[in-house]
């Protein structure tokens, strides 16, 4: 066989080295879109929750009684309330308009708010009422002893206060507050979405029950449950703020009302009574009374019987002040 006739196999194709292979380019556009979506999710959630929170539908279908009645002061228009009650939870559950009206003959309304709402919204509910209704003859302000320390400079963005601001003061200051507390705003948004979409009260029973209660009592809310058997924990000790208390009195005396500032009755079993009795003696229009623990359904909430007892004491003060005012007016007329 001739060497020239031998056929050689074709050479194998050269393999591409990794350096020669076409490089896989990252899908930058897809990645950017993904990041944008991730960034927009909380923005969309917060925006949606704000729209939900501002709707009447939300109040009717969540399960918190305090949120259910939070709009009560803002619904009153041209309402004659010769005695107007404002304050914290101790006033909301502990001052009964029907009892005061029966004892004094004066139409009475209670527009007190939970402590958590006051911490953020302050006197928004009271100021709104005074703008839309005839001014009262008597303005009764009642707070638990620790609340006389005045508003906290850096209050937590809680549900009750944030909801009230969002529904009734949706201006630049409110949205600045949300913007400067992003984590708390997200928590508030999550709460609104959770209570509106997951834990929803389909029949609106909570709203109907709470609303019927405050309409029939002109603002008194009685928390469910029996009276306490013993003190659950000591009430915290906080230094009262005389300047804040004085500013409340001065601000609302300009409305022509007789302003009466009360410290709520104290559980007899709580050892901090002496601390507040001494510090508030010259600042309030009453001395701290001590009530049996059975007249409280929670530390700052009263049973119906406790509210009645407290309201009768306030009615007596109003009657005395009313007679003094009438006598003073008679002398001026003479």
Segments and roles (model prediction):
Residues 62-80:
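Short extracytoplasmic/periplasmic juxtamembrane "stem" segments immediately C-terminal to an N-terminal membrane anchor
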Residues 33-53:
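Hydrophobic membrane-insertion alpha-helices, especially the h-region
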Residues 1-32:
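N-terminal Lys/Arg-rich, disordered targeting/topogenic segments
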Residues 152-255, 331-334:
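Secreted/periplasmic serine-hydrolase-like ester/acetyl group-modifying domain
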Residues 48-62, 232-240:
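Glycine-rich phosphate-binding "P-loop"
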């Amino acid at each position: 066989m001739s060497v020239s006739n031998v056929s050689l196999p074709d050479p194998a194709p050269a393999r591409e080295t990794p350096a020669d292979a076409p490089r896989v380019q990252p899908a930058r556009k897809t990645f950017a879109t993904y990041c944008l979506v991730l960034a927009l999710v909380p923005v969309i959630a917060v925006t949606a929750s704000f729209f939900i929170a501002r709707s009447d539908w939300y109040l009717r279908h969540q399960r918190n009684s305090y949120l259910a009645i939070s709009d009560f002061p803002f619904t009153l228009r041209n309402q004659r309330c010769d005695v107007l009650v404002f304050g914290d939870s101790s006033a909301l559950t502990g001052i009964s308009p029907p009892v005061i009206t029966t004892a004094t003959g004066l139409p009475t309304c209670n527009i007190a708010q939970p402590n958590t709402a006051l911490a953020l919204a302050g006197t928004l509910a009271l100021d709104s009422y005074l703008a839309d209704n005839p001014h009262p003859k008597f303005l009764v302000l009642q707070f638990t002893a620790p609340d006389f320390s005045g508003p906290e400079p850096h209050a937590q963005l809680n549900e009750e206060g944030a909801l009230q601001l969002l529904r009734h003061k949706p201006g630049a200051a409110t949205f600045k507050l949300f913007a400067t507390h992003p984590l708390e705003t997200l928590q508030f948004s999550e709460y609104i979405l959770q209570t509106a979409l997951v834990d929803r009260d389909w029949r609106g029973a909570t709203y109907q029950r709470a609303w019927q209660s405050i309409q029939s009592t002109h603002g008194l809310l009685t928390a469910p449950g029996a009276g306490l058997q013993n003190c659950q924990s000591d009430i915290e000790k906080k230094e009262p703020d005389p300047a804040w208390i004085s500013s409340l009195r001065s601000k609302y005396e300009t409305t022509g009302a007789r302003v009466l500032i009360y410290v709520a009755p104290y559980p007899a079993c709580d050892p901090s009574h002496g601390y507040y009795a001494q510090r508030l003696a010259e600042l309030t229009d009453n001395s701290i009374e001590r009530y049996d623990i059975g007249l409280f359904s929670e530390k700052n909430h009263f049973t119906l019987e406790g509210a009645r007892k407290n309201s009768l004491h306030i009615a007596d003060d109003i009657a005395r002040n009313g007679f003094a005012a009438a006598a003073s007016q008679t002398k001026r007329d003479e």
